[in-house]
């Protein structure tokens, strides 16, 4: 029996979600360009989802879409849209309007997360408290050391190496400025995504024998490799 030319399978992908809090396309573009410049190896030409939950129907979606695309990001969908007219406008622009998954808690009812206590040296940023879902830690021009757990939905970015001495369930992006010599060290690897200088694996790509284990990731011949951390 001949094989079917197509096959439908369920899968999951880890994408960055950009939450818009301003209706001015120029302001949004400048903010995005700054973010991309901080981590070009990961964000340049990256696929993203745009969340418009905080915006009103008065937004000029065509101009906003052009502003976002001008930064090099690729929009794969729009979430958080409650206004029917805005949904129709987005659909006419050729983008799917995505239904969001179950939220843990309404962000409007959640108090702002306090800044994490940080100790810094010339080449290391140290975080000694848990990194919770929705938090992003960026270690500019240095290594990042986390001595506690990292929740799913949290993001670690470092221009240098990343060390996690706890359960790692979020995303870890080392060598964000393009340094291919950077590494990721983790005592319990259950990450949603790991990346070194823009080369990344999502959760499904991490070899099963290393999941939940102490691991070291680095680049060899331009490809991600992993080995047990003793």
UniProtKB/Swiss-Prot annotation:
The keyword Lipid biosynthesis does not apply. GO terms for biological process: cell morphogenesis; division septum assembly; regulation of cell division; regulation of cell septum assembly. Pfam families: MinC_C, MinC_N. SUPFAM superfamilies: Cell-division inhibitor MinC, C-terminal domain. Keywords: Cell cycle, Cell division, Septation. InterPro entries: CAP/MinC_C, MinC, MinC_C_sf, MinC_N, Septum_form_inhib_MinC_C. Interacts with MinD and FtsZ. Belongs to the MinC family. Cell division inhibitor that blocks the formation of polar Z ring septums. Rapidly oscillates between the poles of the cell to destabilize FtsZ filaments that have formed before they mature into polar Z rings. Prevents FtsZ polymerization. This is Probable septum site-determining protein MinC. It comes from Erwinia tasmaniensis (strain DSM 17950 / CFBP 7177 / CIP 109463 / NCPPB 4357 / Et1/99). The lineage of its organism: Bacteria, Pseudomonadati, Pseudomonadota, Gammaproteobacteria, Enterobacterales. The gene is minC.
